[in-house]
């Protein structure tokens, strides 16, 4: 999500910024991607939180919470579309998803389905630290490559790929050293 927020314009420019997809289209799409990116952590958390209920054969509560989220999304979108235009759709999606996360969290705590113990908090803070450091590295790399993005149209994708690989590598390295996870814990099948 941090990468999508910081590099949305470079991503959209590199992938779609050619031909009829002009600078205004790139800017509008990049802004929409940025607002959707704020919801990405919520989308991931919702997938995890819903499993607490599915594992206990409780499909009703996730359904009702999803309905509430959709209604909130629609109400925000419809009520503000006239004032803000298309951009309210990704904003409303992210807001309603975060509200849904807090509702899930409330019901998980209320039903005592999970204890957010010290180990969880330790791993979470280390992961957050890794994301922040990766975001700083990404920001610096975007600054370093900014002239190259503007100068050489045909190499934009290559520069973006290099930035993504370095940022991803830094995230995994920092996560490993900070204790968010260990490389030995990763199992590929």
Language model segments and positions:
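Short alpha-helical transmembrane segments in multi-pass integral membrane proteins
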Residues: 1-6, 83, 87-112, 128
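Juxtamembrane/transmembrane-helix interface segments of polytopic membrane transporters
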Residues: 4-13, 77, 81, 89, ...
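Interfacial segments at transmembrane-helix termini and the short loops linking adjacent helices
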Residues: 5-39, 150-151
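Hydrophobic residues within alpha-helical transmembrane segments
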Residues: 35-38, 64-72, 95, 121, ...
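Membrane-interface junctions at transmembrane-helix termini in multi-pass inner-membrane proteins
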Residues: 38-68, 79, 83
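Alpha-helical transmembrane segments
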Residues: 49-57, 105-123, 146-151, 181
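Membrane-interface helix-loop junctions in multi-pass transport and translocation proteins
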Residues: 60, 67-102, 143-165
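Membrane-proximal transmembrane or re-entrant/amphipathic helices at the cytosolic face
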Residues: 115-116, 140-189
